[in-house]
Amino acid sequence: RLVAHLRKKKFKVGVVKHAHHSFDIDHPNTDSYKIREAGSYKTTIVSEKRLAHIEEKISPEIDIEELIKLNEGCDILIFEGFKKIKKLSKIEVNLKKNNKELLYKSFDNVKLLVSDDMSEHPIKVLSHDQVNEITKEILSDSF
């Protein structure tokens, strides 16, 4: 909902999603898949409407600055799943039913908690439905 809301407000939104496992966005039996499987270090797939860039990582390290450069032109860049990267201000999304430890207790860069648990917390708490307020927080100086 947040991305759609920001888009409605005319922001160009980029999202960088961290995968904790190997993944593939290309499909077997396509030319691009065969080229990549043959050993291409970088493969770019382009159509009239879409562009996808696949790059084989040499190092397991994640370079946030490199990811930001890859997403130049975005007004807002959302990183999802990068909880260990201290350089980024964070919004924690935590539902009571998931019964997970609250990240803000271990990470001091969590600026906002989005939850269905509206009990008192030492950081600001908003519900999933408060998309306008979440947007205001993202656009504030504290992020």
Identify the role of each PLM range.
Residues R1-I58:
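N-terminal phosphate/diphosphate-binding loop that engages ATP/GTP or pyrophosphate donors
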Residues L6, L70-N71, D141:
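P-loop NTP-binding site
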Residues N29, P60-D63, K97:
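Charged helix-capping and loop-helix junction motifs
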Residues R36-E37, K69-N71, L103-S106:
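Solvent-exposed alpha-helices and their adjacent loops that cap or buttress functional pockets
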Residues I76-F143:
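Phosphate/Mg2+-binding loops and adjacent switch elements
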